[in-house]
Amino acid sequence: IDDNAALYFTSGTTGIPKAVLLTHKNLSHACYVEQSHHGQTIEDIFLCIPPLYHTGAKMHWMGSFLAGGKGVLLKGIKPEWIMEAISEEACTIVWLLVPWIHDILIAIENKDIDLSKYQLSQWRLMHAGAQPVPPSLIDFWKKYFPHQSYDTNYGLTESTGPGCIHLGLENAHSLGPIGLPGYEWEAKIVDKNGNLLFANESGELIVRGAGVMKEYYKNPEESAKVL
């Protein structure tokens, strides 16, 4: 279970992208994290839009994979394509990036999308992440989709994708924060000396759990800085 399984690359927001070495334990833990957070069953159908080299796409799908649920891959992000896929494939769970949420809402407002033409009653959960999610955007979303559950996900390639921190379905009334430590994760915020910080103090978020990467591949110097 500790054998090497996959290489994913960081986005490079803080420098040159680094290769992240993940183990079979990392990947299997991601399955359990996602399934624990969103309760996928064999009846769920997940719409996967981002490319699979992105851990945020692959690991969200893993929750359905663990439950034996179906996954649908969509090669495009036009609002009409997304809604058609959800309707035609009877998708129940969809993970969206903020720009896609915005584009769908604008298309609805401009009447480029007529929701009455789609079968959407089975769509039980929309969740978002990978960047700050404006609370006003989700409030706007709920105007059109009031019966859906919602979750915000936070993660990084080094934590095998999303879910080390998440808002939680039960906390959807508290939009804005990224949330609390996810299933079998621990987290705290510290200062530059590693001292624990408290409410309304700014610092660095550190996490611990079975999803933490093995290392930056063939990069012991950078690995030592973060592990």
Language-model regions: role of each:
Residues 66, 91-96, 105-173, 183-186:
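Gly/Ser/Thr-rich phosphate-binding loop
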Residues 28-45, 53-93, 107-108:
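Conserved AMP-binding/adenylation subdomain of ANL enzymes
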Residues 180-184, 195-226:
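Conserved ATP/PPi-binding loop(s) of AMP-dependent carboxylate-activating enzymes
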Residues 4, 10-13, 46, 52, ...:
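Conserved S/T- and glycine-rich ATP-binding loop of Class I adenylate-forming
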Residues 1-9, 16, 39-45, 198:
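Conserved pre-ATP/AMP-binding loop-to-beta segment of ANL
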Residues 18-21, 48, 70-76, 151:
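Short beta-strand->loop structural element characteristic of the AMP-binding/adenylate-forming
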Residues 5-29:
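Conserved AMP-binding A3 loop
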Residues 80-83, 115, 224:
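Short hydrophobic/charged patches on amphipathic alpha-helices used for structural packing
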